[in-house]
């Protein structure tokens, strides 16, 4: 029978529930358990796919093509399980399914209500996502006390009642602030958030206290007394230099022993050797490189969370401190293409994105990298930008652009394809009037690499599988002209469309761009060959 750990948060949002939950999962996995994780989001959007990065941060894409919360990225980076669409759902999805059932007549004319119909749907989805695993860690988004979270909290209350204390555990993350003016740690916010939980029938079994320092014994005893939680189950989650220190930090306070005792799990002791090696590599780099990330969401770096982590992973595997400088592509555009900010950089990366804002600034960055032999990595839009720049400045295609930015451009080298074959062989279609939600090329796709290409050298294989999230493609009508001008198409989709997947420049020290998102499959234990190769290229450029 699957055991459930429910992780909730109180006082304020953005405390790091996802990291805490993933760290617990990593510890339990090291004890030999088969662990999965679920994220329940209270917003009414069906998924975050159409939400602004400024509102939501990164949209993480699963292997089967679900657009999900960035916390699923943390889950995959911390444990070996691969997330799917079953590992994430929102209020919007729950209501959508319940309403569809009502329209079909599944409820036999009954009145459809939050309890039991919505809560039953939530429980069904939790059980569905957890099926086949020893332990399922379920993170409830939002903050306890919010109206939006109430159906989810009621659902997990019912699960405790139905499954019992030995099959369910509540871990609540709370903020314990230090008031500098008074020189005191304040426990009152934690007392109040636990009071809020108790009012809806939830008693925390573990309290994880988010702090900027280690918790003194007096405060631990005080919280235990007033919150009716065992003193040993008051666990500090304090600021650390790297999130990959968190599993060891929580393990050192015995959190996994509390969990295994309550859930009656007879398992081996934790072995965090791999995590200790990762932390040692993070803290003891032998080299340093400066990489410019040129994008338009630089004011909210959470928009590039997986990308930032993938570069850090490459740093771990090359013993390198990867220092990222975020460059606003709009500022380059406004300064008439001035790229002087890039002159001290060892490499340049243009990430994915949507819309025309800042595009010309990104094109200027690509031009600088190409003309000055600076290692360049383009991802998704970053590949399309590189291709547009090459088409204009090398191939001589006047008016080259993407129809995303200029529907009537003279040379649409990037355009919206209206039909393509999915991984399962089915055919999907779309046009300019199609809904934005769920109409992209999403999830893992097969890619065939060209023999002798840089792509094959990087991956060590002629066939790879990478995740995608995009709506526009390289226009195959222009591929021949671009190849004649010296551009190498290093990879194409395995389907009948033969869509361009990677491009490279043969006479450049290291210039590579891909249509897919390799950052979604990088983790600190293994890294990813593309990012490792990119950081090595940056190191070589620095030495040169």
Curated annotation (Swiss-Prot):
The active site is at 380 (nucleophile), 517, 519. One of its GO terms (cellular component) is cytosol. Gene3D superfamilies: 3.40.50.880, P-loop containing nucleotide triphosphate hydrolases. Mg(2+) binds at residues 71, 139. Pathway: Pyrimidine metabolism; CTP biosynthesis via de novo pathway; CTP from UDP: step 2/2. Allosterically activated by GTP, when glutamine is the substrate; GTP has no effect on the reaction when ammonia is the substrate. The allosteric effector GTP functions by stabilizing the protein conformation that binds the tetrahedral intermediate(s) formed during glutamine hydrolysis. Inhibited by the product CTP, via allosteric rather than competitive inhibition. One of its GO terms (molecular function) is identical protein binding. Keywords: ATP-binding, Glutamine amidotransferase, Ligase, Magnesium, Metal-binding, Nucleotide-binding, Pyrimidine biosynthesis. Its EC number is 6.3.4.2. L-glutamine binds at residues 353, 381-384, 404, 471. Pfam families: CTP_synth_N (PF06418), GATase (PF00117). Residues 290-544 form the Glutamine amidotransferase type-1 domain. UTP binds at residues 13, 186-191, 222. Catalyzes the ATP-dependent amination of UTP to CTP with either L-glutamine or ammonia as the source of nitrogen. Regulates intracellular CTP levels through interactions with the four ribonucleotide triphosphates. CTPSs have evolved a hybrid strategy for distinguishing between UTP and CTP. The overlapping regions of the product feedback inhibitory and substrate sites recognize a common feature in both compounds, the triphosphate moiety. To differentiate isosteric substrate and product pyrimidine rings, an additional pocket far from the expected kinase/ligase catalytic site, specifically recognizes the cytosine and ribose portions of the product inhibitor. Belongs to the CTP synthase family. This is CTP synthase. It comes from Neisseria gonorrhoeae (strain NCCP11945). The lineage of its organism: Bacteria, Pseudomonadati, Pseudomonadota, Betaproteobacteria, Neisseriales. The gene is pyrG.
